[in-house]
Amino acid sequence: MNDKKLYISDVTLRDGMHAIRHQYSLENVRQVAKALDDARVDSIEVAHGDGLQGSSFNYGFGAHSDLEWIEAAADVVKHAKIATLLLPGIGTIHDLKNAWQAGARVVRVATHCTEADVSAQHIQYARELGMDTVGFLMMSHMTTPENLAKQAKLMEGYGATCIYVVDSGGAMNMSDIRDRFRALKAVLKPETQTGIHAHHNLSLGVANSIAAVEEGCDRIDASLAGMGAGAGNAPLEVFIAAADKLGWQHGTDLYALMDAADDLVRPLQDRPVRVDRETLALGYAGVYSSFLRHCETAAARYGLSAVDILVELGKRRMVGGQEDMIVDVALDLRNNK
């Protein structure tokens, strides 16, 4: 690792939405965004957990609109860029333009790891707007490193200047991460950046992020207190402490991040964001982390174990966007009891 500065991308106000069913108040957003900005992170992602226009029956309704959340963050931020997430098929280019007008300057266009071809229009439009445009390959554990690299190359061709390996299921280990970054680096242009988005379901969020940086990764997603889907993301303050120990340049204030994690974020959790029986099952079965709260609801409704539902979803290789299948699986399990 040379002396390059890592790009620290906070996702507390987007992935963290999943942990509290998309119920951040505008004041929560202002407080967290200001604390992150004061700690000098590079970008702060703000949106419904499932991206622009994710507020819906399928994914869960948000306490506010994406634009209200983005405007609230943009109002208090002086240093960091406001980022947002867009999943083609949920959000449109019109939603992206509205987000840009509200203050978003970075967009991560997210697709399933084998479906990069649906991102062309959105990536091209983001570039036309002048946004920092990132390709985000979700559930990256579900395809081979070589296939992932081909998908990354497509996104690069559409205009993305950074491509992310996204461990949405928190299912990968350090070797899996290394293999994918080596495959991406072998085909992407030298100037195209790479990023890592880890989940902590196997307690490897920080270790996987470190492995990614050792393979040349430029941008690291993390969240305060790990606030995110499943067992959460790589905890930002923990990653920064580890990076500091390694002598890496990150430009952030560790103690300010520690304070924000414990004083602002942990008190908001109505269900602890941690590795436990259910979230470990997510990582072990390779299931989309944001299925957690939906599965727990279905388990309570139908008198089942959430772990049984999660394991069955893993066997059926369900992916993000198939939240409606959780109830189907629960009914199948109940009927087969």
UniProtKB/Swiss-Prot annotation:
UniProt keyword list: Aromatic hydrocarbons catabolism, Lyase, Manganese, Metal-binding
Reaction it catalyzes: (S)-4-hydroxy-2-oxopentanoate = acetaldehyde + pyruvate
Chain residues that bind substrate: 14-15, 168, 197, 288
Residues covered by the Pyruvate carboxyltransferase domain: 6-258
Enzyme class: lyase
Record-linked CDD domains: DRE_TIM_HOA
Annotated binding of Mn(2+), by residue: 15, 197, 199
EC number: 4.1.3.39
Gene3D superfamilies to which the protein is assigned, alphabetical: 1.10.8.60, Aldolase class I
Pfam families per UniProt: DmpG_comm, HMGL-like
A GO BP entry: L-leucine biosynthetic process
PROSITE patterns xrefs: PYR_CT
Superkingdom in the source lineage: Bacteria
Active-site residues, as the UniProt record annotates them: 18 (proton acceptor)
Pathway involvement of the protein, from the record: Aromatic compound metabolism; 3-phenylpropanoate degradation
Site residues (Transition state stabilizer), renumbered to this chain: 14
A molecular function GO annotation: manganese ion binding
Function statement: Catalyzes the retro-aldol cleavage of 4-hydroxy-2-oxopentanoate to pyruvate and acetaldehyde. Is involved in the meta-cleavage pathway for the degradation of aromatic compounds.
Protein family (similarity comment): Belongs to the 4-hydroxy-2-oxovalerate aldolase family.
Assembly notes: Interacts with MhpF.
Name the record gives this protein: 4-hydroxy-2-oxovalerate aldolase
